[in-house]
């Protein structure tokens, strides 16, 4: 059964690779680890943290520490028309996409693809092909979320904070079948209440974080993008970082690296995938409505 599950996932990955190459001209290896973040572009959903991981991996590859297999970081998102920082995050991701594709030392191992005009048609290809489901919002900010459920149902393994429906997924699949990181909701709320979070302290105290954030305004990036947009995002992260990207960044990198290592045990990864599919039944509309009726509506069958 696990071999059949692997084969189905591989077919879906090949179909997505074909779609991306036809529509965007970017070649993706179907044997890659498909790391996917698809959702509304918002600071609290922290696509910017995923982008900072990409910068970290970029430096790793340049230093000769190559991944076991290629890693395409796939994004699908749209921002509200007047949401300036969200558009700056998209701009950063697109600059990194171009940078990686242009560097022959990097592109065989690491790519970013932000699909154009993300919509339901793209979701129908992305969700079944996903290996790593990025659900990395700041704890306490996600009301629930349903994208994580769709990806879970299609055999993706979640990388996430203990936020929103990730908490329920964690309880359903067990710790060995989900990868969690980051501060808890209680810790985050305490930092807000005390007004004690200072991203500049993390930036100044951690050379790795400083290097990654500084790269946003590196001359390589400025050559590809708009210095105003990149500079604005840089200042936002160092000076404010309201959604605490820098706070969780190092643990996020470590957890994702553990996932990539665990992916190499293909049978065990397929088992994790199968557990996620099986446990996704909890989120069915039938069970939900039955629960509402039992606890709220109290209607009787005729």
Give, region by region, the residue ranges found by the protein language model.
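Long, K/E/R/D-enriched contiguous segments that form extended
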Residues: 13-123, 138, 298
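Catalytic binding pocket for nucleotide-activated donors in carbohydrate/polymer assembly enzymes
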Residues: 128-129, 136-273, 277-287, 291-302
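C-terminal, helix-dominated tail/subdomain
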Residues: 74-77, 131, 185-186
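Conserved aromatic-histidine-acidic binding/catalytic patches
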Residues: 4, 8, 29, 39-42, ...
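Active-site-proximal structural scaffolding
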Residues: 9, 13, 34, 44-50, ...
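N-terminal leader/propeptide and maturation segments of large enzyme subunits in energy/redox metabolism
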Residues: 1-21, 201-208
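Contiguous, well-ordered alpha-helical segments that form the cores/surfaces of helical PPI scaffolds
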Residues: 39, 121-131, 149-150
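Short coil/turn segments at secondary-structure boundaries
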Residues: 3-8, 18-36, 69-72, 109-110, ...
């Amino acid at each position: 059964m696990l071999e059949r599950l692997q084969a189905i996932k591989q077919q879906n990955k090949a179909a997505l690779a074909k779609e991306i190459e036809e529509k965007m001209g970017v070649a993706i290896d179907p044997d890659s680890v498909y790391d996917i973040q698809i959702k509304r572009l918002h600071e609290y959903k922290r696509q910017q943290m995923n982008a900072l991981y990409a910068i970290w991996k970029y430096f790793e590859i340049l230093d000769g520490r190559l991944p076991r297999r290629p890693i395409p970081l796939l994004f699908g998102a749209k921002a509200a028309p007047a949401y300036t920082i969200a558009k700056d995050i998209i701009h950063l991701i697109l600059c990194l996409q171009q940078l990686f594709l242009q560097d022959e030392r990097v592109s065989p191992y690491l790519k970013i693809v932000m699909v154009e005009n993300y919509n339901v048609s793209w979701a129908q290809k992305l969700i079944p092909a996903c290996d790593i489901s990025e659900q990395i919002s700041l704890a306490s900010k996600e009301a629930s979320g349903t994208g994580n459920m769709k990806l879970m149902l299609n055999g993706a393994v979640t990388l996430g904070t203990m936020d929103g429906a990730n908490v329920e997924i964690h309880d359903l699949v067990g710790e060995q079948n989900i990868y969690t990181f980051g501060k808890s909701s209680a810790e985050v709320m305490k930092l807000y209440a005390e007004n004690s979070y200072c991203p500049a302290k993390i930036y100044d105290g951690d050379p790795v974080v400083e290097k990654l954030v500084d790269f946003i305004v590196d001359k390589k990036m400025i050559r590809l993008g708009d210095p105003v947009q990149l500079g604005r995002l840089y200042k936002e992260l160092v000076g404010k970082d309201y959604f605490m990207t820098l706070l969780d960044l190092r643990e996020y990198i470590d957890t994702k690296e553990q996932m990539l290592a665990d992916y190499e045990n293909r049978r065990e990864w397929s088992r994790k995938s199968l557990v996620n599919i099986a446990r996704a039944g909890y989120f069915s509309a039938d069970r939900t409505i039955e629960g509402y009726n039992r606890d709220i509506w109290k209607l009787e069958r005729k």
